[in-house]
Amino acid sequence: MKKAKILSGVLLLCFSSPLISKAATLDVRGGYRSGSHAYETRLKVSEGWQNGWWASMESNTWNTIHDNKKENAALNDVQVEVNYAIKLDDQWTVRPGMLTHFSSNGTRYGPYVKLSWDATKDLNFGIRYRYDWKAYRQQDLSGDMSRDNVHRWDGYVTYHINSDFTFAWQTTLYSKQNDYRYANHKKWATENAFVLQYHITPDITPYIEYDYLDRQGVYNGRDNLSENSYRIGVSFKL
């Protein structure tokens, strides 16, 4: 976690400097997963610059969910993300980026590329491919020590309903590269997230989120449980 603390300090220094960035965004979110009976808390700071760069840092904390040796997940983590927007024209944008994830298990790197299209001033579509590579090894289904690497595809739809409300949908497909399985007993899993934001002021935006996480719930040694996530949060421009 030492690397995470160093990167966190660098990002916070950048966010706090008026010479580098105009204003950061703080996002505070809590959630509950029905299948795993798990509570989560997330704190996220992000900022975009006029030259095309964007960066974020977030910390996720979970309560002690269960004891399941089949699940290769850590309960607490920190991640740092950076990307760069390349404008192809007035409607199309390509964003190559990198997500670095730190947990008690080790470090995971997620290089990605995202393509977005502004269909109208209120409607945006996007697709993204990300490859999650783990710098550490874990026991696979054959008993060998390998890397639980994942191919990930995301689709995005964002619609500004009016000046007060914004709706977003994100659909995700995960596919494990090596001999591992998700809690649904498959090499692949899906997620769908639906978010509704309410813009109280230009600087304060509360939101609600519902996610269906396939049959990835794990509780008291049982897996392949239907998993629903209910979240509520608020973002502040600092």
Regions inferred by a protein language model and the residue ranges of each:
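Detector for outer-membrane/organellar transmembrane beta-barrel domains
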Residues: 91-92, 107-179
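Transmembrane beta-strands of outer-membrane beta-barrel pores
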Residues: 30-36, 59-65, 86, 98-104, ...
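Residues that define the transmembrane beta-barrel architecture of outer-membrane proteins
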Residues: 37-41, 45, 74-80, 107-111, ...
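Cleavable N-terminal export/targeting peptides
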Residues: 1-25
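Transmembrane beta-barrel domains of outer membrane proteins
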Residues: 44-48, 81-85, 93, 114-118, ...
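Short glycine/proline- and aromatic-enriched beta-strand/turn motifs that initiate or cap beta-hairpins
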Residues: 19-69, 77
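Repeated loop/turn-to-beta-strand initiation elements of outer-membrane beta-barrel proteins
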Residues: 24-26, 51-57, 87-96, 121-127, ...
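Outer-membrane beta-barrel "beta-signal"
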Residues: 194, 198-200, 224-238
